[in-house]
Amino acid sequence: MTLKDKKAIKKILRIAKKHPDLYSKAEVMYAKIIKKRLKRMKVTLVQATPKPEENMAYIARVSNPSNQDNENYSGLLKYCIKHNHWSVFEQAFMTLEIETTRAIAAQILRHRSFTFQEFSQRYAKSNELGKIQLPDLRRQDLKNRQNSIDDLDPFTKQKLEAQMITLFSSAQSLYNQMIEYGVAKECARMVLPMCTPTRIYMTGSCRSWIHYIQLRSAHGTQKEHMDIANACKSL
């Protein structure tokens, strides 16, 4: 979704509040759903190696002690990338806080060069991270089983989203009821959908982050995961 789309949604909600007769209830409801989605994914910097570029360049010049304090490190790091001297980029680290869904978290956790800490549904109630949000619906790419195309009919979307609202509300109510009856959280969580929100702390070296961003911002990555990779890149 582009910045222009985001501004259009905010404008619809602002005008609808002042002039409720201009938009149908369905249009306003749909705009609110999209607005919630914009807040669902969030990437925040927690900590990083101080002066990472300077630190990596200093270490890279370990065999040239007389030149280790050279402040011109930009060219050196570009040279290391060009010639695949990746060990240099293992000397700086970064930790990010990522808010996403359980479905996307499962994909992120497959990157084994990172260390993770994830919100535990066994220890805490799942709704502590907010309500279950509706996922974006896209058409299946018939030529690539792991790809989707964002051209699904809007009326089909609205019809299916109405059913999802009912389904998710029912799942959340059942989950709450199970907790009230004393069912263990590790058992009650089984009724929750994959788009249940979660939070991950992801720590890795600069080398790992470069590889992750290159891989997950490329074509073929699920859109929700691609958005996270691009957000990581912007940091």
Where are these regions (language model features)?
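Family-specific signature for flavin-dependent thymidylate synthase
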Residues: 1-235
